[in-house]
Amino acid sequence: MLSDEEREAFRQQAAAQQMSLSNWLRQAGLRQLEAQRQRPLRTAQELREFFASRPDETGAEPDWQAHLQVMAESRRRGLPAP
């Protein structure tokens, strides 16, 4: 729920932009959704920025050979008997 003060501030901003409060709120919501939408990374720079924004990992890398063996065994178990 909006407080009376918030509603009035939003109404004044909408009026300043010659919009109804409903339309102003709709546009604000759409901008918020667009800002949060995930987009594919298209350039090396975007990829660097993405990884720079992630927290540093403190865990150890998995043992990839063991991981590959688990996947191979899983595939073998999934095959029908000859």
Curated annotation (Swiss-Prot):
- Which gene does this sequence derive from? vapB23
Described function:
Putative antitoxin component of a possible type II toxin-antitoxin (TA) system. The cognate toxin is VapC23.
The top of its lineage is: Bacteria, Bacillati, Actinomycetota, Actinomycetes, Mycobacteriales
This protein is called Putative antitoxin VapB23
Q: Which UniProt keywords apply?
A: Toxin-antitoxin system
